[in-house]
């Protein structure tokens, strides 16, 4: 495990994440992975709202091999109805949980860098790649939790 240098933000240790070039990731896959992460990690509702909005911001094309999104906190406030402080808290909680990783600019803002033709060549923001990379782990944990709930239900019914 290594620590990624994000500029100014303290980040949790993460394993390098590489997306295969032929991977055709769409929002449906990301929404499914987010749903599994919410269940597996028992994330609070505010985390779920913000994570859903972040996945909804994904444009369908990786930027530099990463699934980057760059919505502002103000945008997330408007879409979720949460305060800016709550948005900051939730984003840091998602980063600490390893659901997201950050690619920070020098000033900490999220934005895309476009070519003269208007194509996105790079971006700074939040990376959804860990969400997709850990999808199998989340699915396994959800299965274990379901089995445990079923076992408890059967014990209670007896």
Regions found by a protein language model. Name each.
Residues 60, 65-81, 94:
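A short alpha-helical element within helix-turn-helix/winged-helix DNA-binding domains
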Residues 96-105:
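A short, conserved structural fragment
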Residues 105-114:
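Short, Lys/Arg-rich nucleic-acid/phosphate-binding segment
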Residues 90:
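Residues in the recognition helix of alpha-helical DNA-binding motifs
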Residues 1-68:
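Short recognition helix of helix-turn-helix/winged-helix DNA-binding domains
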Residues 132-158:
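Extended alpha-helical scaffolds
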